[in-house]
Design a protein with these regions (language model features):
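Hydrophobic acceptor-binding patch used for acceptor engagement in glycosyltransferases
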Residues: 68-69
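Conserved BB-loop
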Residues: 30-60, 74-83, 120-125
Length: 185
């Protein structure tokens, strides 16, 4: 499985916390890569060391970040962790906005939370250039801008598509009764 080409930011300077659902990484990672390439200091959960206490690390980074971008999709709206990250960022009064990846039906509570700030509806832009131009208009993101990193290679969403046959040697992945696990048969 391909990893994001941008390393999570480590340091004390102002940075952007990215909230996203792992199921959406093929859409989110290319955006993170482009932003990092353009010099933005971004932290996302690939920066959690194995064996670490996940909620503490997330809360610490959300608390210390300057800004938060939440990537909104059906997947993220159905993720308890993504909703908690959004709620915590707003509770801590972080500079916040959302990037809506697809048309979604939000619960009234989430709609109320996200309506306080302007969202960017990525799926409405005809090109990545147009999208990034709009994204970078967010003035507070400029405070999280460091030196560009031209060595980062920006992926395409298809680079992150998982092929079951490549991963497991079979396309036959089934769910067993009374189990939330997936098994090969």
């Amino acid at each position: 499985m391909k990893r994001c080409g941008a390393k999570p930011y480590k340091g004390k300077e102002k940075n952007i916390f990215v909230s996203y659902c792992h199921k959406d990484k093929k859409y989110v990672f290319p955006i993170i890569e482009q932003m990092a390439k353009d010099g933005y200091r971004i932290w996302y959960d690939e920066g959690i060391d194995p064996g670490s206490e996940w909620p503490e690390i997330i809360a610490t980074h959300l608390n210390s970040c300057d800004s938060c971008i939440a990537f909104i999709s059906e997947n993220s709206l159905n993720s308890h962790n993504c909703r908690r990250e959004v709620n915590f960022a707003l509770l801590k009064k972080k500079r916040f906005f959302s990037v809506v990846l697809e048309e979604v039906q939000m619960s009234l509570g989430m709609e109320m939370q996200l309506s306080a700030t302007q969202s960017i509806f990525k799926y409405t832009y005809s090109s990545d250039k147009e999208f990034f131009t709009k994204l970078y208009e967010a003035k507070f993101l400029q405070e999280c801008l460091g030196d560009p990193n031209p060595d980062i290679i920006v992926s395409k969403p298809s680079d992150y598509t998982e092929n079951l046959k490549d991963l497991f040697g079979s396309d036959d992945l089934v769910r067993k009764p009374f189990s939330d696990k997936w098994f090969l048969e």
